[in-house]
């Protein structure tokens, strides 16, 4: 689940010249399986409501209670699986970090790992009710991703006594981001001085390149695909870190592909525009 102000993957926002981020907001929810849905409705300024502790876009809302992030979802799935997706997700951080990471030297892009270790309770219709572990982070940017990056990959992997995150990216000027951090249960964060090597993996069905960091000699592999696109992949990845086998979340984003104009009309099918919205109160 991702909440956007200035929806970076919205063709409508791109076609608008990225002038008004508040006029292109959405709450993107993806569920999988037989009853899986993909929701990414691009909504206008009238749908957006913000306060210190809440963020609402149209019928869906995020609320921070001081201890939990409560996400009330009321969305409509895009093609090819139309239909309502409604319910609640509650994320309870084990701890909240104070870390902010610059992904570009001028802080034009930053990453905030708010709660890399969290418990999640999901109750969504149709067909999704479970509890497990999760995470809560955010990216902030003053420019389009494709204006600064050609490729990036990110992974979060829970271990027995900590969680590790890897952020590897190539900027358009060919400089690199190579970030490896360890998050402890108390919320303390430290950079990993000698991160494991970066290993290439099998490409996706769309031939998106994938790589992650793991122990030397290990063979990371996708175990469950969550979202595949011509420029993007999200999957559960099995790998080995410090001798421990783990399954975590992995993303890969090819921004050279995303930059191609031909993709924008394709995205418009999956990202419908709904400019008008009236809150009942």
Curated annotation (Swiss-Prot):
It catalyses: rhodopin = all-trans-lycopene + H2O; 1,1'-dihydroxy-1,1',2,2'-tetrahydrolycopene = rhodopin + H2O. It is an enzyme of class 4 (lyase). CDD domains: CrtC-like. One of its GO terms (biological process) is photosynthesis. Coiled coil: none annotated. Pathway: Carotenoid biosynthesis; spheroidene biosynthesis. One of its GO terms (molecular function) is hydro-lyase activity. Keywords: Carotenoid biosynthesis, Chlorophyll biosynthesis, Lyase, Photosynthesis. SUPFAM superfamilies: AttH-like (SSF159245). Its EC number is 4.2.1.131. Belongs to the CrtC hydratase family. Involved in the biosynthesis of carotenoids spheroidene and spirilloxanthin. Catalyzes the hydration of neurosporene to the corresponding hydroxylated carotenoids 1-HO-neurosporene and that of lycopene to 1-HO-lycopene. It exhibits negligible activity in converting HO-neurosporene, HO-lycopene, or any other derivative such as spheroidene, 1-HO-3,4-didehydrolycopene. This is Acyclic carotenoid 1,2-hydratase. It comes from Rhodobacter capsulatus (strain ATCC BAA-309 / NBRC 16581 / SB1003). The gene is crtC.
């Amino acid at each position: 689940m991702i909440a956007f102000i200035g929806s970076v993957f919205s063709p409508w926002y791109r076609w608008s010249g990225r002038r008004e981020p508040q006029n292109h907001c959405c709450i993107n929810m993806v569920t999988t399986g037989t009853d899986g849905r993909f929701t990414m409705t691009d909504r206008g300024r009238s749908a957006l409501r913000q306060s210190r502790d809440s963020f609402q876009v149209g019928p869906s809302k995020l609320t921070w209670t001081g201890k939990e992030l409560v996400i009330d979802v009321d969305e409509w799935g895009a093609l090819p699986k139309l239909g309502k997706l409604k319910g609640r997700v509650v994320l309870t951080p084990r701890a909240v970090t104070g870390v902010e990471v610059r992904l570009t030297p001028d802080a034009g892009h930053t990453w905030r790992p708010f709660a890399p270790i969290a418990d999640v309770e999901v109750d969504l219709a149709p067909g999704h009710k479970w509890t497990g572990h999760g995470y809560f982070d955010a990216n902030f940017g003053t420019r389009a991703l494709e204006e600064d990056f050609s490729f990036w990959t990110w992974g979060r992997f829970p271990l027995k006594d900590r969680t590790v995150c890897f952020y590897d990216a190539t900027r358009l000027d060919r400089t690199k981001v190579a970030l490896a951090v360890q998050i402890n249960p108390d919320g303390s964060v430290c950079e990993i001085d000698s991160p494991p090597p970066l290993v290439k993996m099998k490409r996706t069905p769309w031939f998106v390149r994938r790589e992650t960091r793991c122990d030397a000699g290990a063979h990371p592999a996708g175990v469950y695909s969550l979202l595949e696109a011509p420029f993007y992949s999200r999957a559960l990845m099995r790998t080995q870190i410090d001798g421990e086998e783990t399954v975590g979340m992995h993303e890969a984003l090819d921004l050279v592909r995303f930059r191609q104009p031909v993709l924008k009309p394709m995205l418009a099918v999956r990202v419908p525009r709904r400019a008008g919205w009236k809150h009942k109160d």
